[in-house]
């Protein structure tokens, strides 16, 4: 591990990590509010406040299993140095900004994981990777959208059967109310999984500097600042991605929005409790596609879905390459 980092530099690195968390909220705000906005249950300006509140209080409902995975389960903790953390965050932040400006709903989570892998390999080679943890995370790239897809699909079919004798107006009226519940649950899942990723980064940075003693853990102040940064970013979330997620993939009514959010929330809850850092973007997109496919296959704009999938596939190698290049540049400069 590096020698003790000067305090101002340590604070600066923590600030960069919190900036990533803010960007995560900014970039992924659409995941929490896209369906409730596209179904016109809430206006965007009110929806972001709703999502930000539940993003902030998520730490009250979940443990810190995801933070532990990010801190010690992707890259060997003894490999982590301030330079590795900086390079990993740089790769993720650059990618987040580029995709946010382009309106592409890529994954902040996998951008960070790709950044960690790229920076870790640049420093210590492939031996730095904790293959079991990385394998579990990569598997989640595939399984989380598939789980969201099938849960949302089954929910739509079940709800349609239960309300088969109701008029469309009555169903809409009921689910406009229920969507407040489903949006709250999804925002809780988003806050519970996503904020923990930055918690893990800051905690392992502190651990690398000997500030946590011999045992890795996440201090309470780290939990609170990360949840606050994510919630603040959610308040400034971009309409570009809301539009892509909420209407370009498939049109949604309140019942379908409820099913998509509930299917996505259940997926996130399970992953968070298991300590798996999944992509909230992947999850809600899979759920929205599942809802559209339940109506009819042609209801899904597969061209849009395909472009999103391509962005996901590119995220890990792109952020790993940016992070590796950043590490080598800082190493040469040092």
Report the location of each language-model feature:
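Multi-pass alpha-helical transmembrane bundle typical of ion/small-solute transporters
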Residues: 1-334
